[in-house]
C-alpha cells in the first residue's frame, strides 16, 4: 500500500473530500486556499483562491459542478469546480466549522462557532443552482444551540436530507428534522466509554451505501457506529489516542479511524510515540486489524474513495497521503465470514 504523498498546503490539513465519481480529491487546510487533485495519480488540478484565513471545511455537490468552503474568515464561498471561480460569498457572524451540500444539492448546511458572544448555530441555505451568482444571503432554516446543550461541532445530512445529525462539544449526538429544524432526539455517544475528560465530537461520516447509519469520532479516544432512525449506538471502537476523524469503507466491513496525541503533548516526533497512524477496525467484530503509518503528526481528516479502492488522509504535518488498497486488504476475512460466504455460495 504505497501512497502518493501530496504537498500543496503550507499548514495543517483540516478536511479532504472525494467527489461522487471518485476521480477528484478536494482538500483544505489552515492556510487560505483549497486544492483539487486527480485521485488517480495525485496531480494537482488547481486551487480555489479567495479566503483570508483558515479553511475548516469543504464539500462538493453530487454533479461535481459546485464546491463550497467554510472559513475562519467568517465567510462561506461557493465555487465553480470547472473554472475555480468564486460565484458567491455568504457573510457569517462567526467562523464556519462545517459546510455540507444536501444529497439533492438543493440546500447547504453550515455549522458556525460559538464565539464573540454569538450562539453557535446550524444554518441551512437554499441553493440556486440555475443562477449561482444570485443566492439568498439569508438562511432558510436556523437551528441555534438548544438551552442547556453544548455547542455543535459537526453536522451532516442523512439519506434524502430527511434528518440533520449533529455532534456536540460534550459528546452528545442530536437529530433534527431536515425540513423544519425541529429537535427530534439525542444520545450521549461519547464521554461514557472511559474516563477521558474531553468528549468533543470531531467527525461524522455516513455509511456510503445508504446513509442509514453513521460513524463518529471523538477526543475521548473512541468512535461510535450509530443508527440514524433510532440513534442506537451499535458499535464502539476504542483507540489509544484522541480521534479526529472516522470513515466507513464500502466493499469491506471495515472502518478507518485517525487521530493522535496533539503535538504539544508528544515528547518526540516518532509516529509510534504520538500514535499518528490510520487505524483499521472490523466494523462488525470491532477488533483492530491493522494500522497504516506515514504521517508525522495527528491525522486530522480521512476520506474513503467512493468505490472502496483506497482512502486519503490529511495530517497536522501538512501532507495528504493518497492510498490504494492492495490484494491483502480485499482478501482479509475472519473464519466466520469465510464460512458464511461458503454457505451462501452453496445454497445459490
Curated annotation (Swiss-Prot):
MF (Gene Ontology): RNA binding; translation initiation factor activity
Cytoplasm among keywords: yes
InterPro entries in the cross-refs: eIF3i, WD40/YVTN_repeat-like_dom_sf, WD40_repeat_dom_sf, WD40_rpt
Keyword terms: Cytoplasm, Initiation factor, Protein biosynthesis, Repeat, WD repeat
Coiled coil: none
Tagged with keyword ATP-binding: no
Family, as annotated: Belongs to the eIF-3 subunit I family.
Protein's name in the database: Eukaryotic translation initiation factor 3 subunit I
Gene assigned in the entry: TIF34
Amino acid at each position: 500500500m504505497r501512497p502518493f504523498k501530496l504537498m500543496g498546503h503550507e499548514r495543517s490539513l483540516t478536511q479532504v473530500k472525494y467527489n461522487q465519481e471518485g476521480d477528484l480529491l478536494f482538500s483544505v487546510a489552515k492556510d487560505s486556499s483549497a486544492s483539487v487533485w486527480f485521485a488517480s495519480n495525485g496531480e494537482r488540478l488547481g486551487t480555489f483562491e479567495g479566503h483570508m484565513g483558515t479553511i475548516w471545511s469543504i464539500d462538493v455537490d453530487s454533479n461535481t459542478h459546485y464546491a463550497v468552503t467554510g472559513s475562519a474568515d467568517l465567510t462561506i464561498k461557493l465555487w465553480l469546480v470547472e473554472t475555480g471561480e468564486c460565484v458567491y460569498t455568504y457573510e457569517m457572524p462567526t467562523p464556519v466549522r462545517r459546510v455540507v451540500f444536501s444529497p439533492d444539492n438543493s440546500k447547504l448546511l453550515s455549522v458556525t462557532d460559538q464565539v464573540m458572544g454569538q450562539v453557535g448555530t446550524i444554518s441551512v441555505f437554499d441553493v440556486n443552482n440555475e443562477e449561482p451568482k444570485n443566492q439568498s444571503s439569508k438562511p432558510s432554516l436556523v437551528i441555534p444551540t438548544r438551552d442547556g446543550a453544548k455547542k455543535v461541532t459537526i453536522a451532516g445530512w442523512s439519506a434524502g436530507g430527511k434528518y440533520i445529525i449533529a455532534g456536540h462539544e460534550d459528546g452528545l449526538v442530536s437529530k433534527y428534522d431536515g425540513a423544519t429544524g425541529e429537535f427530534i432526539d439525542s444520545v450521549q455517544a461519547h464521554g461514557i466509554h472511559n474516563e477521558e475528560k474531553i468528549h468533543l465530537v470531531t467527525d461524522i461520516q455516513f455509511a456510503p451505501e445508504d446513509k442509514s447509519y453513521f460513524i463518529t469520532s471523538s477526543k475521548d479516544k473512541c468512535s461510535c457506529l450509530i443508527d440514524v432512525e433510532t440513534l442506537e449506538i451499535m458499535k464502539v471502537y476504542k483507540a489509544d489516542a484522541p480521534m479526529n476523524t472516522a470513515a466507513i469503507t464500502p466493499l469491506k466491513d471495515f472502518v478507518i479511524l485517525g487521530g493522535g496525541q496533539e503535538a504539544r503533548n508528544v515528547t518526540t516526533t516518532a509516529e509510534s510515540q504520538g500514535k499518528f497512524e490510520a487505524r483499521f477496525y472490523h466494523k462488525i467484530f470491532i477488533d483492530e486489524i491493522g494500522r497504516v503509518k506515514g504521517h508525522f503528526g495527528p491525522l486530522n481528516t480521512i476520506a474513503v474513495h467512493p468505490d472502496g479502492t483506497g482512502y486519503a488522509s490529511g495530517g497536522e504535518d501538512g501532507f495528504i497521503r493518497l492510498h490504494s488498497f492492495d490484494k491483502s486488504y480485499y482478501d482479509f476475512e475472519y473464519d466466520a465470514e469465510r464460512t458464511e460466504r461458503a454457505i451462501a455460495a452453496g445454497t445459490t
